[in-house]
Structure formats: C-alpha cells, structure tokens
Amino acid sequence: MIETVDIEVVSVNVSLEKGTIKLPVNSIEITEKGIVEDAHSGSWHRMLSLLGVESFERFSKLANRNIAYGEFAENITTKGLELFTCKPLDRFVNEHVALEVTQIGKECHGNSCAIYREVGNCVMPKEGIFARVLKSGSMKSGDVLQYIPKVFRIKLITLSDRASMGQYDDRSGNRIKEWLHEYFDQYKYPIIIDYSLIADDAAMLRNELNNAVENIYDFVFTCGGTGIGPRDITVDVVSKLIDKEIPGIMDQIRLKYGENNPNALLSRSIAGVMKNTIVYTLPGSVKATNEYMTEIVKTMLHLVYMMHAIDAH
C-alpha cells in the first residue's frame, strides 16, 4: 500500500525577475506554463519551485536570523513533508491543481542570488524542489496538497511452452523480479510487478503487450524467445509494436558478453518504446538474465526520465 501525505501550503510567492527573492501574495494562478506574473514560468521543466518550512527552520538556526517566506525564491512554501525526500515524477495534487516533480535541488547561483549575497549560503540548491504543471488552477495559503509518490508499474512476461505447462519453475522470471526490486529500492521508488507466464504464442504475447500499453505500464520485460528456433517469436512480435527502437542497449550487451562467449552474439534481443511504455526482451536462461539485467539497470531511470522530458543531466 502506497502512503500519501497531506501537506499544507503556508505561503505562495512570486517575483518579476530571476535571481531575486519572491514576495508573498494572497493567491497565485497556475497555468500550463507555471505561475502567472512569475519570472520562472515558461515551457520548461522548472516551471515552479517548492520549499518546506522544515528547511527554513534549519537554515534560520544556521544563519541566526529569521527567513521570510519567498526569500529563498520558492514559489510555494509548504509544511508537513521534507520535500527534498521527494523524487522526480512524484506528484502534488488537490481539486484545483496537479504538479509533477521534475528536479530535486539546483545549481547554486552564488553572488547572483540575493540570499547568498547576504548570508553566504542557501538552502534551495539542496532542499528545494521543482515541478511542472499537469493541471491548471489557483492556489493560496491554507490550501492542502496531497503528496503522491511515483509508483513504477512493470509488466513481466515469461514465454515458455514447458514452464507454462508446469514442467519446471520460471527461475529466470523470478530473477528478473529480484533485480527490479533491488534496483528500485536503492532509489526509494516503490514498484508493482504484474507477472504473466505464457506459452511461446504470438497472439498471447501480442495481447499482453497491447494490454500493457493500454494500461500505461512504465516498463515491460519479456523473458525467453529471443533466439532463432521455430518457437522463438518474441522479437518478431515486439519489433512490430515498438515506435522507437533503442539498439545501443542490446548491442552493447551482445558485444560485451560475446567476447568471452560467442553464443551470446546469437541473441536477437531488442529494446524500445511502445507509446509510453519501455520494453526490453531478454533471453530465457538465468545466466543471460543476470548478464542483461546487469547492463539494463544502468540506464533505466535515465531512460524513463528522458521519455518524460525530464532533464536529468
């Protein structure tokens, strides 16, 4: 069960110029480009900024003075959650607006920042967060936002005639599950894995893939059927459904492991994007599963950020 948190908006703040403090106002109007009459609004991934009073309190003690809301140039000052613990793609919503987190912290502007010039330090580069607008509306002090953590939904499909008939356990599929839990746990992203074990059947696989795309799964992993045998149909089915192929991932895996084991070069595995879903096709052996997942996890988050137009460089 994913826990949501209600946080309070304690101040809303705007400025007409970048690099200056923002001043509290009675309310703000949020459009698809950010806050009306605020210098940071625009068609980019940092349309507006948020900072929690929890950060204010810590910095006030270090600076030995009170810090006014908006002085860190945040648009929305909140209470009830350490905002820097949020992650890209988390959301803040209520009946009026919906915001999606795009960045945690930012580069410090040094002497061009008003607060830095005064006290020689700033909390925004480490503890401020940035968001884009998913739903336009108004916001004012006293409003409540619900924090909804991003949950990655993953479809795992193992294709095996014999395993689907119960002749042996799906060890490779179980190993992929372990890899996924270990990977996302380190980034503190919750995941839901929906698992299917089917025969090497093109129609069944196509149905599973179409359902995953229709239900907007973040990732699909297939296991098995990447060779050239008469029942190896996975790549043929997937290749017809992807909109954009990502050849470098699987090419690199084949070359790396094929150097010591030439049989690894025979895999036809592919990776790509089906609308809003990233898909990887893996071979069916446990050994190959470990090899492929070792390389795949190195770029998974960066890939999903790219697909959601989040600049994670």
Q: Model-derived features: where do they sit?
A:
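Electropositive, beta-rich accessory/interaction domains or terminal extensions
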Residues: M1-K106
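Short, basic/aromatic beta-hairpin or loop at an interaction surface
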Residues: R65-N75, C113-G128
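Short alpha-helix capping/helix-loop boundary micro-motifs
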Residues: T77-G80, F84-T85, G128-G137, S141
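Loop/turn positions that initiate beta-strands
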Residues: L89, H96, S136-V144
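Glycine-rich phosphate/diphosphate-binding loop of Rossmann-like nucleotide-binding domains
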Residues: V151-D200
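N-terminal small/polar loop signature for handling phosphorylated ligands or for N-terminal nucleophile
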Residues: Y183, Y189-C223, G227-L241
